[in-house]
Amino acid sequence: MKLTHVDEKGVKMVEVGHKKDMYRRAIAKGRIKLKPETIKLIREGKIEKGNVLAAAQIAGILAVKKTFDIIPLCHPIPLTGVDITFDFGEDYIEVTCEVRAIYKTGVEMEALTGVSVALLTIWDMVKAVEKDEKGQYPYTKIEEIRVVEKIKEERS
């Protein structure tokens, strides 16, 4: 198997200039497990630090836009859209990040970055109510971050 980002000269960013622009979409998901009481506080808008979901959406969108700055071999991609949405369970929030672009390379790393930062932002916003009496986080856990869909298609 030939490595695409490493050769005898060292590490490189893969050349994509010869590739055709195509519609690209990627959807990534992940979950944060929280205490049921914390979920209730988020739903009621009673987290002291502010609007948890709005902060997570803004942070996730900004992260998508900056993916090429934090993952060294990612290309800067002209994005056409980003959506961050939430589904609630009794003791978790599932975050979905959908990223769209018309470009030469895919957007799955952007979707993964967006969902990861949105989840981290939720943790940051609720840490005061998630800590136990020793200042630890025995219930809080980020899990199941994955790409659930990747699309590449020609558009006329």
Swiss-Prot record:
Source organism phylogeny: Archaea, Methanobacteriati, Methanobacteriota, Thermococci, Thermococcales
Catalytic activity: (8S)-3',8-cyclo-7,8-dihydroguanosine 5'-triphosphate = cyclic pyranopterin phosphate + diphosphate
GO biological process, one term: Mo-molybdopterin cofactor biosynthetic process
Superkingdom of origin organism: Archaea
NCBIfam families: moaC (TIGR00581), PRK09364.1 (NF006870), PRK12343.1 (NF008999)
InterPro entries named among the record's database cross-references: Mo_CF_biosynth-C_arc, MoaC, MoaC_sf, MoCo_biosynth_MoaA/MoaC, Mopterin_CF_biosynth-C_dom
Keywords: Lyase, Molybdenum cofactor biosynthesis
Gene3D superfamilies per UniProt: Molybdopterin cofactor biosynthesis C (MoaC) domain
Pathway note: Cofactor biosynthesis; molybdopterin biosynthesis
Role: Catalyzes the conversion of (8S)-3',8-cyclo-7,8-dihydroguanosine 5'-triphosphate to cyclic pyranopterin monophosphate (cPMP).
Active site: 124
Residues noted as binding substrate in the record, renumbered to the chain: 73-75, 109-110
Gene that this sequence comes from: moaC
Annotated protein name in UniProt: Probable cyclic pyranopterin monophosphate synthase
Alphabetized GO MF terms: cyclic pyranopterin monophosphate synthase activity
Subunit: Homohexamer; trimer of dimers.
Organism of origin: Pyrococcus furiosus (strain ATCC 43587 / DSM 3638 / JCM 8422 / Vc1)
Family: Belongs to the MoaC family.
Enzyme Commission number(s): 4.6.1.17
